[in-house]
């Protein structure tokens, strides 16, 4: 029984945090090289970035809800809730950082595109 419990615990810990939270993180879009991309590629990338940002907002709301639930469980003294809360908070912060990086990369691509295509 102890081995089964240990295996189950190890298995659960190896799951990505989004799987344990029932929140699906959006895929990060690829940003084209602005120096060589066509206008059509830049417009398509802009659409993908906007879609990513909207999906990420939904994801952050989901993680935020899970964090609130875990905080309530922490307040009730449930074992393991503090660790789950910390994992959710780290996941939330990583998603915010990922979105900031996508925005920075896309803005850099726009500047590079404009520099390469001054028309």
Region spans (language model):
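Classic N-terminal secretory signal peptides
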Residues: 2-22
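Compact alpha-helical subdomains of small soluble proteins
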Residues: 66-67, 71-119
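Residues at structural and domain junctions
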Residues: 8-9, 38, 45, 92
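Immediate post-signal-peptide N-terminus of mature secreted/exported proteins
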Residues: 20-68
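Processing junctions and N-termini across compartments
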Residues: 16-17, 56, 100
């Amino acid at each position: 029984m102890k081995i089964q419990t240990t295996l189950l615990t190890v298995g659960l810990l190896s799951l990505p945090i989004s799987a344990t939270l029932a929140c699906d993180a959006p895929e990060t879009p690829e940003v084209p090289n602005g120096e060589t991309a066509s206008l059509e590629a830049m417009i398509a990338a802009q659409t993908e970035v906007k879609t990513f940002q909207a999906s990420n907002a939904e994801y952050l709301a989901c993680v935020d809800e899970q964090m609130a639930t875990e905080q309530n469980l922490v307040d009730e003294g449930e074992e393991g809730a503090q660790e789950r809360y910390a994992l959710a908070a780290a996941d939330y912060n990583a998603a915010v950082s990922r979105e900031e990086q996508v925005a920075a990369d896309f803005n850099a691509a726009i500047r590079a595109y404009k520099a390469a295509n001054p028309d």
